[in-house]
Amino acid sequence: MYKAKDLRDQSLEELEATHDESRRKLFELNNEFRSQKKREKPHEMKHTRKDIARLLTVITEKRRENQNQTNQG
């Protein structure tokens, strides 16, 4: 599980790579659920969705910050 404070220290490229990994993980969890109808760790899907939301929030913040710096400079 990621914390927003730790994510803000990463670069935009690292965040996007982590986002891609999390999306793949969620896809695999969805496929596992559909094939087995039972999961060993049902909470993992919820945590992954929340991690993706945190990642997208920090990515958006960084993009806006970069955009504001280019507009002011």
From Swiss-Prot:
Superkingdom classification of source? Bacteria
Example GO BP: translation
- InterPro entries assigned: Ribosomal_uL29, Ribosomal_uL29_CS, Ribosomal_uL29_sf
Q: Where is this region: Disordered?
A: 1-20
Q: Which GO terms describe its molecular function?
A: structural constituent of ribosome
Question: What's in the GO CC field?
Answer: ribonucleoprotein complex; ribosome
Going by the UniProt record, its keywords in alphabetical order are: Ribonucleoprotein, Ribosomal protein
By sequence similarity, the record places it as follows: Belongs to the universal ribosomal protein uL29 family.
The name this protein goes by in its record:
Large ribosomal subunit protein uL29
